[in-house]
């Protein structure tokens, strides 16, 4: 059975998801202790905490501690919709596809992704690429990063005359910075603990890199701050903002925290700063969703068709060991009988007779076992087995 365990932006707020990664690891650990997990792939992003598992023998009473749980076809449908951008807060965003690719590769490196989940995740990536190629679901402003920029614009208006500080030069910070660059902004500052990475991104965007120990000075001058680091601790505490931003500027500064865990302490609001989080981007997501309804409907059709193909492929995969064993036995029989025939044909004046004997011998040996099983079924009055044999050999039932 394939199992998906998750919390995401649809069911939980940021604070709940901040603690979810530890709790989901405990759940998976408990399942592993029961010997129920054969394959696993975690998927952790700012908007979701998920595990995909191949499991056997999960007790019906097992407690999943409030997490959403889906099985088999429902779990597969969720993953394909996720890869297509249909489950994202910003519908159609591309970042999730890269995150799914990375999750698969990491699990393969760690040896936790086996052949079944590898097949499933490979299919998910293919479906995500197909949806984006055949629809316009990812056109325009679709990432969390660009949504954060849109939110800042809705408050400040045109940002061309504003100083924007991006904290974090990882994947999410890069998305934010590029969304800013698309608007041809000049005053972009990038701060990162690793200065070289900040410098690299700033050069790419025509902005300025900031040493992390000079972050307070950058805060003092910024009109918009968008923070997206991977830090487990607050980057901007109440005390830091109070020290860095003069009282007369606090009400005009906009801070958008799109990190998980949070980068900006909630009490910063008490200073008069306008602070927004991922939860506040839901409105932007809803507007985006309305614009993309037609594309989403087309994408849903693609996903459903691809799901049917995946389910068919998985069913084929289940019988491959049986088919391989049958073929192996047939091949062994062929080789044995061919060996006998070759020896005979070397000393025979009638090779046609040898070939005739070879083919008859092969048919007799194959038919012998089949006949035994069919006669046994007839003695047991097993009509279903007899019907299946008729169907298998394309015979009329008598």
Curated annotation (Swiss-Prot):
Catalytic residues (positions): 46
Top-level taxon of the source organism: Archaea
Record pathway: Porphyrin-containing compound metabolism; protoporphyrin-IX biosynthesis; 5-aminolevulinate from L-glutamyl-tRNA(Glu): step 1/2
Name of a matching Pfam family: Shikimate_DH
Binding site for substrate: 45-48, 88, 93-95, 99
InterPro entries in the record: 4pyrrol_synth_GluRdtase (IPR000343), 4pyrrol_synth_GluRdtase_dimer (IPR015896), 4pyrrol_synth_GluRdtase_N (IPR015895), GluRdtase_CS (IPR018214), GluRdtase_dimer_dom_sf (IPR036453), GluRdtase_N_sf (IPR036343), NAD(P)-bd_dom_sf (IPR036291), Shikm_DH/Glu-tRNA_Rdtase (IPR006151)
UniProt keywords, alphabetically: NADP, Oxidoreductase, Porphyrin biosynthesis
Enzyme nomenclature, EC number: 1.2.1.70
Marked site (Important for activity) residue numbers: 78
Class in the EC hierarchy, top level: oxidoreductase
Tagged with keyword Oxidoreductase: yes
Biological processes annotated in GO: protoporphyrinogen IX biosynthetic process from glutamate
Temperature and thermostability: Optimum temperature is 65 degrees Celsius.
Main function: Catalyzes the NADPH-dependent reduction of glutamyl-tRNA(Glu) to glutamate 1-semialdehyde (GSA).
Family per record: Belongs to the glutamyl-tRNA reductase family.
Comment block on domains: Possesses an unusual extended V-shaped dimeric structure with each monomer consisting of three distinct domains arranged along a curved 'spinal' alpha-helix. The N-terminal catalytic domain specifically recognizes the glutamate moiety of the substrate. The second domain is the NADPH-binding domain, and the third C-terminal domain is responsible for dimerization.
Something else known: During catalysis, the active site Cys acts as a nucleophile attacking the alpha-carbonyl group of tRNA-bound glutamate with the formation of a thioester intermediate between enzyme and glutamate, and the concomitant release of tRNA(Glu). The thioester intermediate is finally reduced by direct hydride transfer from NADPH, to form the product GSA.
Complex and partners: Homodimer.
Protein name, per record: Glutamyl-tRNA reductase
Species of provenance: Methanothermobacter marburgensis (strain ATCC BAA-927 / DSM 2133 / JCM 14651 / NBRC 100331 / OCM 82 / Marburg)
Lineage: Archaea, Methanobacteriati, Methanobacteriota, Methanomada group, Methanobacteria
